[in-house]
């Protein structure tokens, strides 16, 4: 457990709306994001937008006690305050290294990220429609916090 970590389970995604005509702002919370069904203290961080539909974003589920990325959550921004988010968790003893990238293959959207399990590094693909995850072992160590970008060539 990371005892130096100050914020434990307090960072949540909020929607800020700014009306440029009236200069009024509002903050909306999603009650479902306050209580994701996981058995650890968590923060949500590093939101990224879907490439197929700007209505959806994906956030990193960060285990605040262990200092590890345990999964990702899909959030509907059009129905923010009432939508139940879709949660994608890594298998036991597997952790993400950083925020995912959204990639499209064969008309399907995936989250692609580096991950690790027992000192081995992987590239993991999560199908956001089915929730299935496939991981491919890579022959080098990828450290936690490694940021990346994937692009088509």
Where are the regions that the model predicts?
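Beta-propeller domains
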Residues: 1-153
């Amino acid at each position: 457990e990371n005892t130096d970590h100050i914020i434990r389970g307090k960072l949540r995604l909020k929607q800020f709306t700014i009306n440029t005509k009236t200069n009024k702002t509002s903050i909306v919370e999603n009650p479902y994001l306050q209580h994701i069904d996981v058995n650890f203290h968590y923060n949500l961080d590093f939101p990224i937008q879907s490439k197929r539909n700007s209505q959806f974003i994906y956030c990193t589920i960060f285990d605040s006690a262990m200092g590890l990325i345990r999964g990702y959550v899909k959030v509907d921004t059009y129905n923010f305050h009432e939508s139940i988010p879709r949660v994608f968790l890594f298998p036991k003893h597997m952790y993400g290294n950083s925020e995912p990238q959204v990639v499209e293959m064969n008309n399907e959207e995936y989250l692609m990220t580096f991950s690790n399990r027992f000192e081995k590094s992987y590239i993991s693909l999560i199908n956001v429609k089915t929730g299935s995850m496939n991981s491919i072992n890579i022959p080098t160590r990828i450290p936690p916090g490694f940021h990346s970008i994937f692009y088509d060539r």
